[in-house]
Amino acid sequence: LKAVVAGNHLVVLEDISTFISDAELEQLSGILHHYAKKGMSFLYIAAHFEEARQICGRTALMLNGQIIKCFQAKDKAPDPFFLHCTEDFDRHVREQMNQRPRPEENQIVFQAEGEPAFSVARGECLVMQDLDNCMIQELIPVLSGEERHSAGQILIDGTPLGGKNDRRIAVIQELPVHSMLFSNLSYLDNLCFTLDHRVRGVWGSKRVKKSLRQEYAELLGEEVFDLPVDRLTEWQKYDLIYTRIYLQNPKVVFCVQPFKSAEVSLRIHIMELLERFLNKGIPVVIMAVNLADSLALADRLLRVRRGGKV
């Protein structure tokens, strides 16, 4: 509406579905079509063809910065060829899912008066869809130990969570490359940031850091250990963050909108990083507004809104 009042002729919307609910997206679609009929133009940038096709009158597929094909609303949907990379990965995920440890008895439980109670078991991937885009922001401070819930608690193996320094729980924030890396620390120091509970004196031990470098050089790349964090690529930053949490070895990992603003190949890589936790038996709770991508790994889907489950 600000764009309408300002008299703009072109409005660019990027990854809108990652921070508004399905109901809000449907309302937005109606608003866009209303003003499109009045002469305004909209450029809708999305990671998913199906999402863009539902809203837009014309859809373009891009690869390596180039448009490879355009579709009008009346055109037949593209062949799976255009999405072969994600389909191949989906098959890979299904094969790996069959080999994963099956969820056992519930080990992590969240209970709170007036909030959705949930539990997650070893090796399980639980996807929580926030239907009104309110629950995630309210739960994250509680899950990370920054705030205490007045009428609830988190139980891990029957023991309450012990505050934000409790390494039994890990929270991977939304857009973690902007909030979970420390540019004033070296690559190895960033990697060891949550390892102090497992290795005594890790900060002053050159021997431990040398051992970690040797062990993870093949996985992360030898060159990254000598680079400033700010010079890492997007992929290398995600590798660093997820490997740090992997080394932390928490009882449960909460991921907030893990695929937000990630292009297709990076989303596939993030799925592989999440799968490492699951293969190790570490449960993963994906907290998202949009279900795209998340369901490929999900054992269960929990749809929540303020006041309880749906």
Describe the residue ranges of each PLM region.
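ABC ATPase nucleotide-binding domain signature region
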Residues: 130-199
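Pre-NBD coupling/linker segments of ABC/ABC-like ATPases
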Residues: 69-109, 206
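ABC-family nucleotide-binding domains
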Residues: 14, 20-21, 256, 262-263
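H-loop/switch region of ABC-family ATPase nucleotide-binding domains
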Residues: 45-47, 287-289
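A short, surface-exposed alpha-helical micro-motif characterized by mixed small hydrophobic
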Residues: 52-54, 294-296
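ABC-family P-loop ATPase nucleotide-binding domains
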Residues: 1-2, 180-244, 248-251
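Helical segment within the ABC ATPase nucleotide-binding domain
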Residues: 25-38, 267-280
